[in-house]
Amino acid sequence: MKELIEHIVFQLTAMHTQIEILTDLQDSSFKGKDDYWRICIENIIENAARYVHHEIKIILKDQYLEIFNDGEPIDNSNPESLFQPYEIGHKGQFGLGLSIVYKTVTMYGYKVEAVNRVDGVSFIIQRKISRMI
């Protein structure tokens, strides 16, 4: 996953020269096909680039990926709708990117959530914790 993210960041840095993209990447492997994860991560980063003020931060740890942007907070009135198809934010396009992210993440047994921070928004992907009863 680390190499995949480095490749995506390299490509996006050339396209978004006004945005600083910071990374803290550890070696980690996520279950699933790299092509699906590439599309998923590109969708989140492209979405972040639409709302960012100055910087995007990407953190990768074991079974944990966080993509932060220092843009405006997300409307929390209906957080589940964020990942629904055709749900378009105020700078959004077709409303499909985050629904693709959600489908990819859940298909491989992970969860995704959008978290408002004091200084921006984080999209966090992590392995679902299964509980033994």
Feature map (PLM): residue ranges:
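Short beta-to-alpha transition helix within the HATPase_c
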Residues: 1-14
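Conserved micro-motifs of the catalytic ATP-binding
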Residues: 25, 29-35
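Conserved polar catalytic motif of the HATPase_c/GHKL fold
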Residues: 42-43, 47
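Short beta-strand/loop element within the Bergerat-fold HATPase_c
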Residues: 53-64
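Conserved glycine-rich
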Residues: 54, 109-110, 114
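Short conserved segment of the HATPase_c
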Residues: 74-86
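Short alpha-helical Gxxx[C/S/T] motif in the catalytic ATP-binding
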Residues: 97, 101
